[in-house]
Each structure stands twice: as C-alpha cells, then as structure tokens.
Amino acid sequence: PNVTPTGFKKSRAEFEDLIYQNMRVAGSTTGTGGDQTIPTGLQVGLGVRPTTVHKFFSQGDYQNTGNSLDFAIEGEGFFQVMVNGEEAYTRAGAFKLNQDGTLVTANGYVLQPEFTVPVETKEIIVTENGRITAMDAAGEELASADIPLYTFINPAGLEAKGRNLYTTTGASGDATEGIHGEDNVGTIAQGFLEMSNVEVVDEMVNMIVGLRAYEMNSKAIQTADSMLQLAVQLNRS
C-alpha cells in the first residue's frame, strides 16, 4: 500500500545495542598464579532497541495525469498548507477545488497562499516558477498568484502528521521560502504527480533477507532445545 500514495516517503528504523554484561574483562589477569592477561574478554549483549526512524525524502517517479490541478515538485521543496490554523508541509500535489473555488488538498487543507479560482475560469496555467493564472474563455487573465516552495536544513527532522503532512521541529529548522530553480529549490510541473519513493524490488529483497534471518534464528533455538532435551534424557538414564 505504501507504493501507491502520492508523495509518500519511505522510512527506515535504526537500532542501537543495549548495555553489555562483562563476564571477563579485557586486560584483566587470570588469577591462576601465572597472571596471564586476558586479551579480549567476554561480554554478553542484552539485545537492541530502536533509536530513531529516519525518513528519506528522495524523489519518487513522476506520473503524467494531464490534470491541471496536479502539481509535482521537480527537486527539493514542499508546498505549504494550513491545517487547523497551523502551517504544515507536503509534497503531495494532488489539489482540488472546494465549494468556494479555493485550491485545497484531498482532505480539504487550503494551499498557501490561498488562491480562489473565479467562476468564469476556463483554464488554469501553472508555470515552473510557481505562477498560477486563471484564464477565461477569451484567454484573458482573471486571477493570478505565486505558489512558493519551502525547504529545510534537515528535512529528516520534520514530524510526520499522517496524510503526507509534516510540521517543523527544532531538528528540522524553520521553513525557508526559496526561489524556484535556484539554490537546490525545485520547480513545479503541472499535470504531473510525484509518486511514492518506495522501490518494490528493494523492499521485497529486504523482506526475504529478514525472513531468512528469522528462520535461521528459529532453527537455532529449536536445535538448542533438542540438544537440551537429549541431555536431560541421557542424565535420567
């Protein structure tokens, strides 16, 4: 299901090992009279724990939809939308018109700055530098505005809110409005959507590797259990 959502970004869990129980300390002596130094020691690990979930904002493939309200960001940047009075950011550019003719996301969040399409509009044109223009049947301009793109020093530090929305944190840094096509800021492609950046083949391979590791550990436990049962039976006999 994560392959199909517009603008979905994959994540990877990262782990760290827990504290170790020192059975034999490296560099200590044997204490058997020879005072030999133990070269490596013996530590027993107590497992691992998750430390973070890293979000990857690499670009996904582009799909040509032909819909004039579909906008794909070619390069870095986020659209800004208003969610319950707070600013949020998204790369999912599948916009709609609400009952007032205002550009909104599929969930009704208003694209910033707010742009309302006049009733007489017959065509909507968006240039790569974010200029959106509503035209009438005669080709005359009815309304226009600029759609800004925002970048972050550390986009991986954004907080995911679901529905392909993100909010700023102390780790992400503040949103910076950029100039389209300059300083690594992307441009806007009308009639296209950015799809998920999840690679099906890679995820299938990773799943198979994880499954094989699980099966190996399971068989090791079964073998150890069988050996323990055999030892108990031999002791009884």
Please provide the spans of the model-predicted regions.
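Amphipathic alpha-helical polymerization modules
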Residues: P1-S237
